[in-house]
């Protein structure tokens, strides 16, 4: 199977690109959705979070307590990622099995380390991304700035870069061009 990861910073347009690729008939999987539907409520993950952070309440991960812990101990983010990423990737590969080509929308491309894949980076200027996040999530400028600061990772090396600061029609043309360069259409 050929796996192509779609990544980019918050508000960059990853979901828009992924939705368009799906509309073209390709298998597209959202790693956040996999985490939220398959991983976060699994007994082994809950036990691991309790062991690592002690942030389980009434048999579920207490997201607020976990966020507070990570805010106070940012070095523990790596432990959280080590607990979550292998589980998400296993579910992704299970779901994608049987497809010749599969796209995966990922927040953290490092989660796919050790798995052969291509990387498509969706970009947009910070001001454009902030507007999108505000419209989508109803967040204040201060909240958005804090979220951007937490996720201010360097842009990964990408096989394809798609600038989404354009009209919907132009973005579709850019994605089609990327699909052609990848010899998928």
Which residues does each predicted region cover?
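Hydrophobic anchor at the beta1->P-loop junction of P-loop NTPases
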Residues: 6
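P-loop (Walker A) phosphate-binding loop of NTP-binding proteins
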Residues: 9
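ATP-dependent small-molecule kinase phosphotransfer cores
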Residues: 33-100
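Small-molecule kinase domains that catalyze NTP-dependent phosphoryl transfer to phosphate-bearing small molecules
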Residues: 91-92, 115, 135-185
């Amino acid at each position: 199977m050929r796996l192509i990861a779609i990544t980019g910073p918050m508000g960059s347009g990853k979901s828009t690109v992924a939705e368009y690729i799906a509309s073209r008939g390709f298998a597209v999987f959202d790693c956040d959705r996999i985490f939220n539907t398959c991983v976060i409520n699994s007994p082994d993950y809950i036990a691991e979070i309790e062991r690592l952070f002690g942030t389980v309440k009434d048999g579920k991960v207490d997201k607020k307590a976990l966020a507070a812990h990570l805010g106070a101990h940012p070095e523990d983010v790596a432990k959280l990622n080590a607990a979550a990423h292998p589980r998400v990737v296993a579910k992704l590969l299970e779901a994608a099995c049987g497809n010749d080509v599969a796209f995966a929308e990922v927040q953290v491309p490092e989660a796919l380390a050790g798995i052969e894949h291509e990387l498509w980076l969706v970009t947009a200027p910070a001001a454009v991304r902030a507007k999108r996040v505000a419209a989508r999530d109803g967040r204040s400028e201060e909240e958005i700035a804090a979220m951007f600061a937490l996720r201010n990772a360097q842009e990964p090396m990408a096989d394809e870069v798609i600038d989404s600061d354009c009209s919907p029609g132009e973005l579709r043309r850019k994605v089609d061009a990327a699909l052609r360069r990848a010899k998928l259409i």
